Amino acid sequence: WLAPLKAFREDISPLVAIREYIRLKLEVSRDHPQASKLFCLEMLQGAPLLMGELTGDLKALVDEKSAIVSGWIDRGKLAPVDPQHLIFMIWATTQHYADFATQVEAVTGA
């Protein structure tokens, strides 16, 4: 689940980078919905098994990618936004379809 964020790069435009990140996140959620749901349950329980990963590798990766977003903002390539919260919003949107598949199916009839 970290692979899509690792692919997020500064050497391409913000539009292309964010679009590609969203595409990759949607693919992971679509192709591995059970893993996404399991991760969601782990978070709801306070991350008893993954706290070290969250405060270690994940935090470092989010800090690294947030710096990329800040650089785009500083160079006028992206509207001002809190970089961490942008990443959180992308996570929320892309994982929603897997984590809440029952709700999505009930509402859309699909």
What function would you assign to each model-found segment?
Residues 1-2, 16, 27, 31, ...:
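Amphipathic alpha-helical packing segments from all-alpha helical-bundle domains
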Residues 3-37, 83-90:
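Hydrophobic alpha-helical connector segments
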Residues 10-11, 57-60, 99, 108-109:
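Short, low-complexity, polar/charged sequence segments that are solvent-exposed and flexible
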Residues 36-38, 51-52, 70-110:
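Hydrophobic/aromatic-rich alpha-helical bundle segments in the mid-to-C-terminal region
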